[in-house]
Structure formats: C-alpha cells, structure tokens
C-alpha cells in the first residue's frame, strides 16, 4: 500500500512507519484509514492505466493525483525523454527517442523473424522429395513467409500468409 503524507511525499507502508517513528510519531498495529487520518496521511489508490499511444509507448507511473477527495496513482504514456548532459556531452530528447525506437524496432523484428522461422521449420517436411503434397503451393507459401520482412509496416504490422491445407 502506498501512503501520501501531509508533506505530499508518497511512500510504502514500511517507509511510512519508519518515517513516522523517526519524526516522533506513534507506532500502531494495523494500518487503517482511521490511523492514517489521525496521522494526517492518506491511502493512495491504484489509478487507471494510461491507454492509447503508439507501439513504442507504455503506461508508466507519474506521481499521484487527487480525484473526488481521494489520492490515486497517476499514469502517463511513456517513456518520457528529456535532454541530458553527461560528462559535458548533451544527448537530446529526440536523439534518445530515436535510439529507443530503433531498439524497439530491432526487438520486434527479431521476434517476427523467430515466428517466421518457426513457421518455416514446421513445414520443412513438405519439401522432401516423397512428401505427399503440392510442392509448388507449399513453395509459394514458404516464399511468402520469407518475404514477410519486406512488407510495408514491418516489423509492427504483418500479414501472415495462410498455410496450405
């Protein structure tokens, strides 16, 4: 459970107990709403996850917000990039975002290729000389699998070929 103190600090229950004790406050057995109210603190409820965005984004916590008198974890779409200076070298938010997207694209491409390779492996048997199948149909399917990486939208939007029957 997260707790918001009078100062606006947000911490977990164990931290709050230590914080209260370190500041001369009382100790208690079970943390209840009544105990927190007496100590001038509030429970922080889990807020709604952020939705929407792009394939590069995810919901991430960004502080707390008060809604109808209760405190909730606030979520935003991330990641959030900011200009940074490390050892005198500036890396802009745009540069970080470009690098992040390239990494995500590479990860997704690797995953799609692994799926494609698995589909190819699963139908290798169709290319054996004595396989009782229409080799031309299967060869066309297998080539379509190999061509998945050339599709517009790769690696995020894939139209998989239909496996022959």
Label each region the model flagged:
Residues 1-165:
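A preference for well-ordered globular domain cores
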């Amino acid at each position: 459970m997260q707790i918001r103190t009078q100062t606006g600090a947000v911490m977990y229950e164990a931290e709050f107990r230590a914080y209260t004790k370190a500041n001369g406050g009382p100790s208690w057995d079970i943390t209840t709403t009544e105990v927190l109210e007496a100590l001038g603190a509030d429970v922080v409820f889990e807020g709604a996850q952020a939705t929407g965005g792009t394939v590069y984004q995810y919901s991430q916590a960004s502080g707390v917000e008060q809604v109808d008198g209760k405190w909730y974890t606030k979520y935003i779409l991330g990641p959030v990039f900011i200009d940074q200076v490390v050892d005198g070298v500036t890396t802009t938010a745009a540069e970080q975002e470009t690098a992040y997207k390239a990494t995500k694209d590479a990860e997704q491409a690797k995953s799609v290729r692994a799926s494609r390779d698995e589909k190819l492996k699963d139908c290798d048997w169709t290319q054996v000389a004595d396989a009782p199948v229409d080799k031309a149909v299967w060869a066309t399917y297998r080539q379509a699998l190999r061509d998945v990486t050339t599709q517009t939208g790769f690696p995020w939007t894939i139209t998989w070929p239909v496996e022959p029957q």
